[in-house]
Regions:
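Active-site nucleophile and cofactor-binding loops and adjacent substrate-binding regions
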Residues: 1, 13-17, 34-42, 100-105, ...
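Acidic-glycine-rich active-site phosphate/pyrophosphate-binding loop
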Residues: 15-26, 77-87, 134-149
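Glycine-rich phosphate-binding loops at beta-strand->alpha-helix junctions
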Residues: 106, 119-145, 158-159, 275-277, ...
Length: 720
């Protein structure tokens, strides 16, 4: 539709009532698609709700915004936080027109910085179409023009462009034969619909479906999470299309525990959570060999989540972590009195070129959260075993585990023998996963089927966490593969980021494999609250785009509505079809495009008196540090204060899922060059690193990327 209205269109931005879409056009075909990753925050319904709160209509709200002299800066965060910002602005005396204008800016900033991730207006290309019902709001249109500094085309039917495009497509494919299936005017007089409700029993989700039967006998199903429910028929459980999520889940948890009389050391419970989706085969084999009967917690479901809600200390933690509470409760409800849930700081180092093999802070330490928040663990009859374990150091494990299980008097020789069996099973499973991946790829190649590598963490295997997205992919006629089934060590390093998390190292490897395979695409799963993905998502995108591929991210949490996921997957499928493998294979592929040369701060620069910019990170300590650095002969300038402009720069050049301090600190540094207060050819920047599993270790990589995107890649970054 946009191409028909503006031939040669380069970008299409669509903001509707519930979602945002950005289409980049190249050679008259969709080159990439970006959709808001999850909720409808910052879309048309967002403005409508605020207009009603202010006692006016959307049209009246927009008219007031156009009269504003001082729009309020309300940020681009979640609607919940925006509500707080609006209330604060009202307390400070802001007028309705200024609040309305501020909200219009927020909607556009949300689209530009979170969805499009715009670094420069030039990235939009010469011809831009804006559409969707939200752009019928003149205030939103004007905010877009002011923020991008360019005029755009808004069709008069902006809210109906989807229908217009569908009509154009129908006309293009019309053979001139047959009759339209649209309801005739005379049939509308007899139109009626009967509504019934039914529970789908095709999987454990048990969706509550609404079935609408129309007067002509056709039916429409709503409320279903996947295509199986829409069919109203029992589809065979075993599809020919590969679904490695289903296969791997059953393989990992398919072990048979010892019988009671063989388990001479008794029962021990293990929760089916987080890194157990990676390590359960290892721990099961170890404990079974030692004579324990391993009792696994049940499959996750929403009722299990609700069982543990009272002990969840933070609403901001990711859903996979929230589920842990319910799993521990379920084990205790079964009468298990010994629960083993270790804190694994380091995983095995499986990727030789990776910088480290940490687990993320949540995965590594969540047993401590459980210990300190689950009151039932204070029962003297309950033993909760949560030692800190380093799986990358095999030599120390026998002695360490003997200490952990001291009450069972296990000798170091017995523990060593059991560990050998555990390592064998762990290696066998990992090889089996790779073999299964190769088998599935070969099958898809022979049957001309496209595959989606649904990449995330091991715990995204959990159907309660992935909400049936693998089945949705299979329902669209594509195979669903896991990232560890396709990572084969072909990625060239070093990466821009510090590659320090074990699960993400193979995520990067899988991205390289996907980029090299014309029949594979990648969809990255991201759980709400995962701060690490602010680092990984950009790196995966660089790897894929360097190989001419599309990067798609799906954000998921405890809400099981898959509407946004379904839109994104279908959009991806349509974009791939339109682009075609022929074009992809003809593209120039840069397998090293993700590798960037780093500019070093040299002795010559220091002797020449180069300025070093330091952000304000700790006022008391830095007030002492800067004079010390001056005494050492370094020309250091401390950036004392932040401003709305520095935050705006941070939003523009840093992934908006990064923590607020990262946006402020990095925005502060880059803004010095953007505003012309620092010479990029005689200035370096300095930033600290934690050196641990926290994402703060990657502040330096975020800074390097931001400087490069802003056009200052020659600036040295000093990180320590």
């Amino acid at each position: 539709a946009a191409e028909h209205i503006l031939p040669g269109v380069s970008s299409v931005i669509d903001i509707g009532g519930q979602d945002m879409k950005y289409l980049r056009i190249r050679n008259h075909a969709v080159d990439s698609i970006s959709v808001n990753e999850a909720c409808s925050s910052g879309c048309g319904s967002f403005l409508q709700t605020f207009a009603q709160t202010m006692g006016t209509t959307v049209q009246g709200f927009a008219h007031l915004a156009l009269e504003s002299d001082h729009p309020v800066d309300l940020g681009t965060r979640c609607t919940v936080f925006m509500n707080s910002s609006v209330k604060q602005a009202q307390k400070e005396g802001a007028s309705v027109r200024d609040i309305s204008a501020g909200l219009s800016y927020s909607v556009v900033r949300n689209a530009l910085y979170k969805v499009i991730k715009l670094k420069s207006p030039d990235d939009l290309g010469p011809s831009v179409v804006v559409q969707g019902g939200t752009f019928l709001n003149d205030a939103v249109l004007r905010a877009f023009e002011l923020l991008t500094g360019r005029q755009v085309v808004r069709p008069g039917i902006a809210g109906l462009m989807g229908a217009y495009g569908a009509a154009l497509t129908a006309r293009m494919h019309d053979s001139g034969q047959g009759e339209s299936s649209l309801v005739h005017l005379e049939d509308l007089a007899d139109f009626h619909v009967d509504t019934t409700r039914k529970t789908c029993r095709l999987c454990q989700n048990h969706c509550q479906m609404t079935i609408s039967t129309f007067s002509n006998g056709t039916r429409h199903v709503s409320g279903n999470r996947c295509e199986r429910g829409a069919s109203l028929e029992r589809i065979p459980k075993k599809s020919e299309l590969p679904n490695m999520f289903d296969w791997k889940y059953k393989r990992i948890f398919g072990y048979r525990r010892l019988t009671e009389h063989k388990a001479f050391r008794g029962d021990i419970g293990i929760p089916r959570v987080l890194n157990m989706y990676e390590n359960y085969p290892f721990w099961f084999t170890l404990l079974s060999t030692l004579g324990f009967r391993v009792m696994l917690s049940p499959r996750s479901n929403h009722a299990l989540f609700e069982k543990g809600m009272e002990s969840i200390p933070s609403e901001n933690v990711c859903y996979p972590a929230k589920l842990v509470h319910g799993h521990i409760e379920a084990l205790l409800d079964k009468g298990i009195r010994t629960v083993f849930y270790p804190c694994v700081s380091y995983e095995q180092r499986l990727i030789s070129g990776a910088d480290n093999c940490f687990n993320c802070p949540v995965v590594a330490t969540y047993p401590e959260v459980i210990r300190n928040n689950l009151e039932r663990l204070n029962d003297p009859d309950v033993t909760f075993i949560s030692p800190f374990i380093n799986l990358s150091n095999r030599d120390y494990l026998p002695r360490r585990l003997c200490e952990v299980f001291a009450r069972w008097n296990i000798s170091e020789e017995e523990m060593t023998a059991a560990l050998e069996e555990a390592w064998k099973e762990d290696a066998a499973l990992k090889q089996e996963v790779r073999d299964k991946g190769a088998e599935n790829i070969e099958w898809m190649r022979q049957h001309n089927v496209r595959g989606i590598v649904l990449a995330g963490r091991p715990y995204h295997l959990d159907p309660e966490i992935n909400h049936g997205i693998p089945e949705l992919i299979v329902g669209l006629g594509m195979g669903a593969l896991t990232e560890d089934s396709v990572c084969d060590g072909r990625l060239e390093r070093p990466l821009r980021v510090r590659d320090q998390w074990a699960y993400h190292s193979r995520l990067y490897e899988a991205a390289a494999r996907v980029g090299d395979e014309p029949d594979l695409e990648m969809v990255q799963l991201n759980s709400f609250g995962c701060g690490v993905d602010a680092i990984t998502a950009d790196q995966v995108q660089e790897i894929l785009e360097g190989r001419g591929d599309v990067h798609t991210v799906l954000k998921i949490d405890e809400i099981s509505n898959l509407g946004a996921a379904r839109i994104r997957l279908r959009s991806l499928d349509a974009a791939i079809e339109e682009r075609g493998n022929v074009e992809r294979e003809s593209q120039t592929v840069d397998t090293t495009g993700h590798i960037h040369e780093r500019t070093a701060f040299t002795r010559q620069m220091r002797e020449a008196g180069w300025q070093i910019l330091v952000p304000q990170m700790a006022p008391f300590q830095f007030s002492l540090l800067v004079p010390v650095l001056h005494r050492a002969g370094l020309n250091v300038r401390l950036l004392e204060r932040t401003s709305p402009e520095t935050l705006e720069t941070g939003l523009k050049y840093v992934n908006n899922d990064a923590c607020y301090p990262a946006l402020v600190v990095i925005g502060q540094l880059i803004d010095e060059f953007v505003a012309g207060r620092a010479d990029p050819d005689r200035t370096a920047v300095a930033i600290t690193q934690t050196g641990g599993m926290c994402r703060a270790t990657n502040y330096a990589s975020l800074l390097r990327k931001g400087l490069r995107d802003a056009g200052f890649e020659q600036v040295p970054v000093i990180a320590a």
